[in-house]
């Protein structure tokens, strides 16, 4: 009974994080289309600012315990690896894919992350994937494809660069799901997500120099940045990764496909985006994946 309650809690947290990502995507779309923001500028600002925010909150709650992770060399290296090869790598390769193709193509390719995780888990455990695990992966990827392209494969722009960076973003998404779990159990959300974003943001800021490409910071921009940084980054990653620490990387990555569902609904309601009938099938496939995972438990992963 207690295990089922904890599983439901993990599913809820993971879904809530994915929904926050979907909401923040609409704020990001507004900044790109109306305020002239670039992907490099927004990602560097969101990671660094959200990281600082979480570390401040963490210090208020935990004080000097916030730095305990650096007292153990192995854990400090894991945290640095999560920051660079998980958090930063996933974010950066996703937006580079968008640059070489479009958002729909990038979303579909990154949605292959559960496949990467399932392959890793099965190889590590020397087990074949179970039928419902394969069904969940296929359902989620197909659902994301339908939502991102409206069922038209010609809406995907698969240049060599887009394919390379898109697959890299799937590996990055798998990495931050897998790398975060042990650290979260030992140190909590504020330490892992806070330092992960802070270090990742520092590295990216050094590369893209966002201060050289500032956009006008009017009221609309600040409100949209609040949505991206607070709702879509600090809160979203904290909820999502806490959920992943409970349900596991494979299930978490599949539940995270709720993001495009939320993004399309919010875009249709507030940004005037068109809603097509084929999107309903995508909704059904993704929500069916969520239902399937709530009833079954995948292989032990992390």
Task: Please identify what each model-predicted range represents.
Residues 35-88, 116-120, 171-179, 193-212, ...:
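Transmembrane alpha-helices of multi-pass small-molecule transport proteins
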Residues 1-45, 84, 155-182, 202:
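Glycine-/small-residue-enriched transmembrane alpha-helix faces in small-molecule transporters
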Residues 39-52, 95-113, 159-171, 220-231:
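Structural signature of hydrophobic alpha-helical transmembrane segments
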Residues 31, 42, 46, 97, ...:
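Hydrophobic/aromatic residues within transmembrane alpha-helices
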Residues 53, 94, 113-138, 261-281:
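C-terminal transmembrane-helix exit sites in multi-pass transporters
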Residues 54, 58, 129-151, 204, ...:
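Hydrophobic transmembrane alpha-helices of multi-pass small-molecule transport proteins
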Residues 18, 45, 87, 91, ...:
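Helix-helix packing/entry segments at the starts of transmembrane helices
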Residues 59-105, 146, 229-247:
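Specific transmembrane alpha-helical segments of multi-pass solute transporters/efflux pumps
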């Amino acid at each position: 009974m207690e295990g089922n309650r904890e599983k439901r809690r993990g599913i809820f947290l993971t879904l809530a994080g994915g929904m926050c990502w979907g909401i923040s995507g609409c704020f990001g779309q507004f900044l790109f289309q109306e305020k002239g923001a670039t992907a490099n500028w927004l990602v560097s600002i969101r990671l660094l600012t959200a990281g600082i925010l979480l570390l401040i909150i963490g210090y208020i709650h935990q004080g000097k315990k916030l730095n305990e992770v650096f007292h153990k060399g192995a854990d400090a290296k894991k945290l640095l690896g999560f920051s660079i090869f998980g958090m930063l790598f996933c974010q950066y390769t996703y937006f580079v894919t968008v640059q070489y193709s479009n958002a729909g193509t990038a979303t579909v390719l990154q949605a292959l992350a559960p496949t990467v995780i399932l392959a890793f888990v099965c190889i590590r455990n020397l087990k074949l994937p179970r039928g419902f695990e394969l069904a969940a992966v296929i359902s989620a990827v197909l659902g994301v494809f339908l939502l991102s392209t409206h069922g038209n494969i010609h809406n995907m722009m698969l240049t060599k660069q887009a394919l390379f960076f898109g697959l890299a973003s799937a590996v990055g998404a798998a990495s931050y799901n897998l790398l975060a779990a042990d650290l979260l159990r030992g140190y909590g959300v504020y330490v892992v997500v806070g330092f992960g974003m802070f270090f990742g943001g520092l590295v990216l800021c050094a590369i893209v120099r966002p201060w050289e490409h500032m956009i006008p910071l009017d009221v609309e921009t600040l409100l949209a940045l609040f949505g991206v940084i607070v709702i879509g980054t600090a809160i979203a990653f904290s909820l999502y990764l806490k959920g992943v620490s409970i349900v596991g990387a494979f299930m978490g990555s599949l539940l995270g496909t709720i993001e495009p569902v939320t993004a399309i609904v919010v875009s249709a309601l507030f940004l005037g985006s068109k809603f097509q009938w084929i999107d309903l099938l995508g909704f059904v496939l993704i929500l069916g994946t969520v239902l399937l995972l709530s009833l079954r438990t995948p292989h032990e992963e992390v």
